[in-house]
């Protein structure tokens, strides 16, 4: 599993996805991120994601984003787990 610190993430690297629920995302989030809730992302990855793009996943505690990275890697996506988010 590839990892990166949130402070090292730059928009040019790829798309930053916050997998928290919309309410938690609205309360506080990285301004460079887009919100795609964990369940929605995993159920609809084939229509939401492009295997030719790079994705960086974050959440508040790291559990869901880490789990999502493992699953999406299995499906062949270029995903990186963002730590210290």
Give the predicted meaning of each segment.
Residues 28-31, 69-71:
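Short amphipathic alpha-helical segments
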Residues 46-85:
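Catalytic cysteine-centered active loop of the rhodanese-like fold, especially the PTP/DSP P-loop
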Residues 1-30, 38:
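Flexible, polar/low-complexity N-terminal or interdomain linker segments that lie immediately upstream
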Residues 34-40, 75:
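A short, gly/pro- and small-residue-rich
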Residues 23-25, 42, 63-65:
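Glycine-rich nucleotide phosphate-binding loop and flanking beta-alpha elements
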Residues 15, 32, 51-53:
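A generic structural signal for short beta-strands and their flanking turns/coil linkers
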Residues 7-10, 41-51:
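Short amphipathic alpha-helix with an adjacent loop that forms part of the alpha/beta core around
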Residues 16, 33-35, 79-81:
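Conserved beta-strand scaffold positions in the cores of enzyme catalytic domains, especially
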């Amino acid at each position: 599993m590839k990892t990166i610190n949130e402070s090292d993430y730059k928009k040019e690297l790829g798309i930053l996805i916050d997998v928290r629920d919309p309410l938690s995302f609205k309360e506080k989030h990285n301004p460079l991120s887009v919100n795609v809730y964990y369940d929605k992302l995993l159920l609809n990855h084939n229509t939401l994601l492009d295997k030719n793009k790079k994705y960086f996943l974050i959440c508040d505690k790291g559990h869901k984003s880490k789990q999502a990275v493992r699953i999406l890697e299995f499906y062949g996506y270029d995903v990186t787990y963002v730590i210290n988010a």
